[in-house]
From Swiss-Prot:
Compartment(s) where it occurs, according to its Swiss-Prot or TrEMBL record: Cytoplasm
GO BP of this protein: rRNA base methylation
GO terms of molecular function: rRNA (cytosine-N4-)-methyltransferase activity
UniProt name for this protein: Ribosomal RNA small subunit methyltransferase H
Species of origin: Staphylococcus carnosus (strain TM300)
Gene, per the UniProt record: rsmH
Gene3D superfamilies attached to this UniProt entry: Putative methyltransferase TM0872, insert domain, Vaccinia Virus protein VP39
Recorded family membership: Belongs to the methyltransferase superfamily. RsmH family.
PANTHER family attached to this UniProt entry: 12S RRNA N4-METHYLCYTIDINE METHYLTRANSFERASE, S-ADENOSYL-METHYLTRANSFERASE MRAW
Length: 311
């Protein structure tokens, strides 16, 4: 069963200033908690386009949203295809778009998905199980230099070189096939003193591999830049992130579009092409409430950023 507790459910949707007859896009359908909360605010003219690259999530969501099926279009795709998805549906602009990034609880909790460093399973980590590249290929086939790069860039792991070297040495003899095998190899690459602080020693490397397998950061960047162009004036975009890399990227993109192009000196009035595309609704990200934290420990690292489209 695909059971997932949605983080910052009310805040994410309420910040969209939902119009009863609006058209909205859920870029990360997951357990459909946000979708259900939104649909309950729409009248019969409102509609939701629900995107997920995990077929299991979509099948579960159809059950969760069974009272609203005539108001939902389910799309099995990566959210970086948002332009194509809206074009295919003959939709130009929508009233709001939202993202709940990161891994859903069921993906972490089902050992066979190969995301968890607590449970043993074959290395996988694919959010879209129809894609070819999995964690197994990354760990066993990617060269040392690429492993160092992703561990450092996506995991902010300071022992990236040592861990990549241990992986390289281990796989010379036999493939690293399971999550707990990989955990043991990672531990060997981290000095004993460092292993005792900063949470689970494999956390950062697992995050890095997951991001690489699913091309998460580039996919999000592509998607958010498209989303900004597909939301109507005064429509909003809500984004929940779960680690500093995603949050930083979201902040940078919003800032870039808020600044607008450099205005030439001496103009008596500023032409529209030099005005900002959007404004950030919250300068500082919104954090999870105590209520959220009590329900879901993952909410501790969650941050919500919201932007409103101006033109």
């Amino acid at each position: 069963m695909f059971h997932h507790v949605s983080v910052m459910l009310r805040e994410t949707i309420d910040e969209l200033n939902v119009k009863k007859d609006g058209v909205y896009v859920d870029c990360t359908l997951g357990g459909a908690g946000h979708a259900l909360y939104l649909l309950n605010q729409l009248d019969e003219n409102g509609h939701l386009i629900a995107i997920d690259q995990d077929l299991t999530a979509i099948e579960n969501a159809k059950e969760v949203l069974k009272d609203h099926l005539d108001q939902v279009t389910f799309v099995h795709s990566n959210f970086r295809q948002i332009n194509q998805i809206l074009d295919d549906l003959d939709i130009d602009k929508v009233d709001g778009i939202y993202y709940d990034l990161g891994v859903s609880s069921p993906q972490l909790d089902v050992p066979e998905r190969g995301f968890s460093y607590h449970q043993d399973a074959r290395l996988d980590m694919r959010m879209d199980q129809t894609q070819e590249l999995s964690a197994y290929e990354v760990v066993n086939e990617w060269p040392y230099e690429d492993l160092v790069r992703i561990f450092y860039r996506y995991g902010e792991e300071k022992f990236s070189k040592q861990i990549a070297r241990r992986i390289e040495k281990t796989r010379e003899n036999e493939p690293i096939e399971t999550t707990l095998q990989l955990v043991d190899v990672i531990k060997e690459g981290i000095p004993a003193k460092a292993r005792r602080k900063g949470g689970h020693p494999a956390k950062r490397v697992f995050q890095a591999i997951r991001i690489a397998v699913n091309d998460e950061l580039k996919a999000f960047e592509d998607s958010l830049e498209q989303a900004i162009e597909r939301v109507k004036v005064h429509g909003r975009i809500s984004v929940i992130t779960f680690h500093s890399l995603e949050d930083r990227l979201c902040k940078q993109i919003f800032q870039e579009y808020e600044k607008g192009p450099e205005v030439p000196r001496g103009l008596p009035i500023i032409p529209e092409e030099y005005t900002p595309k959007l404004k950030r609704v919250n300068r500082k990200p919104i954090s999870a409430s105590e209520e959220d934290l009590a329900e879901n420990n993952r909410a501790r690292s969650a941050k919500l950023r919201v932007a409103e489209i101006l033109k």
